[in-house]
């Protein structure tokens, strides 16, 4: 698309970043200054009753800056990147029609990618193929399947952890059904986003700082009643660790503790480690992201001013 035709498109802002990087605080600050409406881009914040462990904006923050696409699913329900793209496009159109600018904030990079580039033509799930993969995993272990994926699709294998059976089996399933790798197919994009997008990523300057913030926030969640929140979900009786909601970072580890599989201290250790691993994956995505303007979490006023400098011209 030419620069002239791109300039005629409606405007949008992406505010991306790893967990615990200060995205929400910056988005709320920007809403006070710019004519923006916030849309959450987070695969955990969609779930009702999952507030503490997801660091969902609190009532005061939501009063100051309402977020769209929060609390739109029960934890028993699935929600795909395709669902997100459909819902986000509808919200963006609504915001644009009101003469305001959509500000999409979150850390689910797959959602941002699906929105920006469109969805690739991946084959639908095949229960027979999936059952065959799971049978092989039961006999040989997921490590063996991960080695198989390394031979078939080394790019996907580098991105998918051997302990992530859902994504691992999906990558193999796609290849067995289509004869093409997940990497090949995901490079075939769908409809591009019909907006002129200003993209920002916020993160601390050092990994050590991010690790500290993650550990502090996990302990704050525990002090705020995270265990009681997960106990309420656990007591429902219809939720389990095969659901995307309960596989969310922190929830999965607390669930293992409630089931008596691990000690409290082990749960805390694993929860912090899993959150750090999530942040590492998010940063890896962002480092390969084109056209992104980096902001420093430790300098919030400077970060705000940099956004205003870049997008100030579009706010009129």
UniProtKB/Swiss-Prot annotation:
The keyword Zinc does not apply. It is an enzyme of class 2 (transferase). Substrate binds at residues 19-24. Keywords: ATP-binding, Magnesium, Nucleotide-binding, Transferase, tRNA processing. SUPFAM superfamilies: P-loop containing nucleoside triphosphate hydrolases. ATP binds at residues 17-24. Pfam families: IPPT. Residues 42-45, 166-170, 247-252, 280-287 are annotated as: Interaction with substrate tRNA. It comes from Escherichia coli (strain SMS-3-5 / SECEC). This is tRNA dimethylallyltransferase. It comes from the Bacteria. One of its GO terms (molecular function) is ATP binding. Its cofactor is Mg(2+). The gene is miaA. Belongs to the IPP transferase family. The record marks 108, 130 as: Interaction with substrate tRNA. It catalyses: adenosine(37) in tRNA + dimethylallyl diphosphate = N(6)-dimethylallyladenosine(37) in tRNA + diphosphate. The lineage of its organism: Bacteria, Pseudomonadati, Pseudomonadota, Gammaproteobacteria, Enterobacterales. Catalyzes the transfer of a dimethylallyl group onto the adenine at position 37 in tRNAs that read codons beginning with uridine, leading to the formation of N6-(dimethylallyl)adenosine (i(6)A). One of its GO terms (biological process) is tRNA modification. Monomer.
